[in-house]
Amino acid sequence: MLEVLPADVAELVEQGGVIAYPTEAVYGLGCDPDNDDAIERLLEIKLRPWQKGLILVAGDYQQLLPYIDESQLSAEQLAFVHSKWPGPFTFIMPVKPGLSNLLSGSFDSIAVRVTAHEGVKALCAAINKPIVSTSANLTGQDPALSGAAVKQQFEGIIAGLVIGDLGIQASPSTIIDAKSGQVIRKG
């Protein structure tokens, strides 16, 4: 498993690699959201059913526009979303037509977040798009809180480990439905 800096990860991701990287609260596993083979590999590693869908984490809102259909949201709904970003809030938003079901699962929406974590922002800047994100843990194990824990669980399984520090969030992000405003998970 290669250890890389956030700015140097682009080649691994562009080649379809699954990587681990520090986020606000735990290490995440991620890949290119436009590469179905990479997404399938990520789902296999996690033993996660595709029907559940995945989260996209972006460095800025513009990176999310190819994936979400903001025309289905009112100006007030969008203003509320923007008031929470960047930060530890994940929003369920309508998907653009034609988006891979591997990302949206069995839903007509997708979970998205604009991060405030400098390392994740650098990673997204390096690949010039959001990254698929799910917690770095095997089924039944706690999410990895260190690079050593990532190596223990994923050595020989993933393409690389991004070097960096976890953020200061003690819990996962709050999840809110952008259309209804309903809090789905309190972070």
Curated annotation (Swiss-Prot):
Chain's gene name: tsaC
Domain named YrdC-like: residues: 3-187
Disulfide bonds: none
Reported function: Required for the formation of a threonylcarbamoyl group on adenosine at position 37 (t(6)A37) in tRNAs that read codons beginning with adenine. Catalyzes the conversion of L-threonine, HCO(3)(-)/CO(2) and ATP to give threonylcarbamoyl-AMP (TC-AMP) as the acyladenylate intermediate, with the release of diphosphate.
Name the record gives this protein: Threonylcarbamoyl-AMP synthase
Superkingdom to which the source organism belongs: Bacteria
PANTHER family: SUA5, THREONYLCARBAMOYL-AMP SYNTHASE
Class of the enzyme per the UniProt entry, highest EC level: transferase
Family: Belongs to the SUA5 family. TsaC subfamily.
Reactions catalysed: L-threonine + hydrogencarbonate + ATP = L-threonylcarbamoyladenylate + diphosphate + H2O
EC number: 2.7.7.87
